[in-house]
Amino acid sequence: MQFTKMSAFATLALATLAAATPTRRNDSPSNQCNTGSLQCCNSLQSANSASLAGLLGLLGVVVGTITGQVGVTCSPITGVGVSGTSCSEQPVCCTNNAFNGVIALGCSPININL
């Protein structure tokens, strides 16, 4: 009988300890892109947008090859949370920013947790 009580107490104590053990949290900002670079664009448009067609044509971009959205007037975001670095528009991850900030291709909106 004594062994049963001791066994039950040990089981209960271990269960309580396991439930109270702190776990590591990852509170770092999600400021990394899985692919491409983090950008701040003045607008984000569909690749087949009529208002964007002329600009894409001037830059020689074939609309059918674009996946994702197109960011217009983009600048890189570096050092998220650093004083002076801000993005008043939707931050995006873009896979092709080879157009000197005029446009960025393959953009997906992201959430930056500060």
Curated annotation (Swiss-Prot):
It comes from the Eukaryota. Its main location: secreted. Disulfide bonds join C33-C93, C40-C87, C41-C74, C94-C107. Keywords: Cell wall, Disulfide bond, Secreted, Signal. It holds the Pfam family Hydrophobin. CDD domains: hydrophobin_I. Residues 1-20 form the signal peptide. One of its GO terms (molecular function) is structural constituent of cell wall. It is found in: Secreted; Secreted, Cell wall. Induction: Expression is induced under conditions of inorganic phosphate (Pi) deficiency. GO terms for cellular component: extracellular region; fungal-type cell wall. Belongs to the fungal hydrophobin family. Aerial growth, conidiation, and dispersal of filamentous fungi in the environment rely upon a capability of their secreting small amphipathic proteins called hydrophobins (HPBs) with low sequence identity. Class I can self-assemble into an outermost layer of rodlet bundles on aerial cell surfaces, conferring cellular hydrophobicity that supports fungal growth, development and dispersal; whereas Class II form highly ordered films at water-air interfaces through intermolecular interactions but contribute nothing to the rodlet structure. Self-assembles to form functional amyloid fibrils called rodlets. Self-assembly into fibrillar rodlets occurs spontaneously at hydrophobic:hydrophilic interfaces and the rodlets further associate laterally to form amphipathic monolayers. This is Class I hydrophobin 1. It comes from Pholiota nameko.
